[in-house]
Amino acid sequence: MLTGALLILAPLFLGFALPLKNRQAMTVIHYSVEALVYFILGLLGLGLGQMEGLADQLSGMAVQVLVLVAVLFVANMASLWLFHRWQPMVPVKGEVEGNPSYRRLFLAGLKPMLAVLVGLLAGYYLLPPLPMAEIVATGALMLLLFFIGLQLRNAGLSLRKLLMNRQGLGIALALTLSSLIAGVLLIPVLELPWHDVLALASGFGWYSLSGIVIGDALGPAWGGVAFLNDVIREIIALAIIPLLISARPAMAIGYGGATAMDFTLPVIRSSGGLACVPVAIASGFLLSFLSPILMGVFLSLG
């Protein structure tokens, strides 16, 4: 089903094992990661655009995405609320800054969807079927994971220290377990094998990874479902962080999943203060590490 599902993870661990002190090289890697993300998302859109019966597929995808987002939202927020009750965390008052530009953040959140849309239109109207597209996408994903492994290793973060951050570790575990429970509940609804549904539930907001990995394994339609599920998670997170973080920071930080260490971090910092930053980085880092592992393991069972 998925060619070397576990093999795809090897570049992530290889990159994480390599120390790299050259700041100029890390800058190049940063921009390379961004370019690869949009390239991969464009290929995902290309696959969607070249599906037979595209209109019917898209209407079916809309229902699947809504169900997936809703069930995961309820399960994640319930588990994060329970964790907050068990291990309450109170942001330090006086550290909160002014809100960042939500217009800029919203537009940034639309960029990945635009990349998929461009690919979809190109596949539907312009380009003939490209037999090598799947191989190219898999290769690009492996290169992306290698670069991300390098970034994680050289971000000045100690895995031991991250694991010792009880709030960050607890948030990551709560989100992971509740997502898998939600996946179990969704098995009869999505009508997929249990391991494929659990893979869908393991994106944790990492849309560029989940979209292409799920698409490679289950076809472009399910890749689109995984992508939209994780993009919508990111957008919802941006909306709820300022509303929840002062009273229930675990819920505000945790729902964003893997995005807590990058895309949603500025909102967490400005709304919750400095005390929330180490927790967000720890939980986001751990979920970024768990997501490809869980997806690879579950998809390899098919």
Positions of the model-derived regions?
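Juxtamembrane boundary at the C-terminal end of a transmembrane helix
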Residues: L290-G302
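Membrane-interface helix termini and inter-helical loops of multi-pass transporters
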Residues: M51-M61, Y125-I135, S158-R160, P188-V189, ...
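Entry/N-cap segments of selected transmembrane alpha helices
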Residues: T3-L12, A55-S79, A108, P112, ...
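Alpha-helical membrane segments and immediately flanking helix-loop junctions
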Residues: G45, Q50, D196-I236, A247-A282
